[in-house]
């Protein structure tokens, strides 16, 4: 019987990408195939995230539930990867000695060797080192199902925002070689992928070495990927405003395949709080980026992150954030109350704002964002949108769903066209809007 692997993924798209790579690596080396049922698995991996509060406790809670599976099947391999693993290291094994493997984001390619060592020595294996970009040299070719795919172009972050653990868990910024990224995208194109999402903690900082020794910036990488005929859409996350260059803005003018949507986290609107966060820009500088971008893409959809209740945030600071939100008119936002991450400078800052006040601020902020989201969706009714059909609708398996350029899910009846539309670009007339989705009718070309 073929052995199986189960992976539970927490957090960002980078982790989703890494989880797919774990499956690829262990399929190539061990013949493992993916299962959605932990009880059926021979290997169980938790790919963790440490960005939010109590991340470690959530991991140990999950490990506690897996302990019984290990008791009933001593040959079961349990591993913890990702950013919590990078932070905690040996402490995970000390607290949960039944864990076999602990590995960081940069060492997932070493899983086959770690498994081998675990079996031969009987001892838990821990490797949370930062061997730069080495992991991409040991990856088997990507295998995908569907018309969309993630491609990691760089690892780590060197910005050291005062609240963020990423530089400590994923290391400094390191870019993949230019031709390696293009080769991966071309391989995905050959498998029928039409939409690529380029990933990095700060994609704007991409500086990939080319075959001739020159260095390619992010804008040049986008331009080359756009030359691949089968790739029809290009997305990317995450961007840091400090390095959102004029060259990248110019790419929006020159590359129609860049979608009409940008996720550009502001985090706050008060210059005083932005300085305390060590973000490296002012509210005015942030708005200047979007003003110049909207000169070349007037209707571009903008989403962001906002942290409410950063230590020392006053009513005036919060009002400055609300002013930024109203000035920009965000389409969507990931907004949350500040939670101190151990080991970061912000964790040591005095926080005298009551939780009730933070909660009220968050609710007010999110209400404005939600109004914007609904208004933009309502304005799409009566328009024709080109969508990439991703598969059956989650609401009705007899229907299909796709996604617009501005990241709206559209559900529609496929009729006689059926499943053959999956993976195709089609035009739909938007006939109804809901809180987070749209309803469309497919336009049949004569």
Swiss-Prot record:
GO terms for molecular function: 4 iron, 4 sulfur cluster binding; metal ion binding; N6-isopentenyladenosine methylthiotransferase activity. [4Fe-4S] cluster 2 binds at residues 157, 161, 164. Its EC number is 2.8.4.3. Binds 2 [4Fe-4S] clusters. One cluster is coordinated with 3 cysteines and an exchangeable S-adenosyl-L-methionine. It is an enzyme of class 2 (transferase). One of its GO terms (cellular component) is cytosol. Residues 378-444 form the TRAM domain. HAMAP family: tRNA_metthiotr_MiaB. Monomer. This is tRNA-2-methylthio-N(6)-dimethylallyladenosine synthase. It comes from Janthinobacterium sp. (strain Marseille).
